[in-house]
Amino acid sequence: VPIITHCEDTPMIDAELARHRERYGDDIPARLHPDIRSREACIRSTRLALDLARRHGTRLHVLHISTADELELFEAGPLVDPDGKVRKRITAETCIHFLRFAREDYDRLGHKIKCNPAIKEASDRDALRQAIAGDVIDVLATDHAPHTLREKETPYVRAPSGLPLVQFAL
């Protein structure tokens, strides 16, 4: 049975959120979401999870990969050998929104694309697309979160994370 985990370093995120709240209060600009839920928070947590899984021989599935740097931590190749034997003990998933949007889209869409982990750079988006073709990403998910437009239009600290994306699974 695999362990399934969402990897972000909470103390790093909490420190960045506190720093931004000092400056902006509750109305932090949406474009700063990738600074609060940073690439470093993702990489550190993902690296730790993979190190522990490898050390203990644990099957691990990491959810919501959002950076090119995280991709480098995973093995490329098919999930199973031609004889049907499981080849990968550690697998990765990314979400549709990480393949569609990039950091600059926060300026136009604001909290409508606020999700955890945050959408990162265009270069990360491009690397994730390539990772699907290269058998590094094993699962593509929606991470469906049916928040209303009214909820998404609230100030940063009240605007929920997640996007309503179930339609892409159909």
Regions found by a protein language model. Name each.
Residues C42, R158-L170:
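Gly/Ser/Thr-rich active-site loops/lids in small-molecule metabolic enzymes
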Residues T142-R150, L165-L170:
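Active-site anion/phosphate-binding pocket segments in diverse small-molecule metabolic enzymes
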Residues V1-L140:
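Histidine/acidic residue-rich metal-binding segments in metalloenzymes
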Residues R150-A159:
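Basic, amphipathic juxtamembrane/active-site segments
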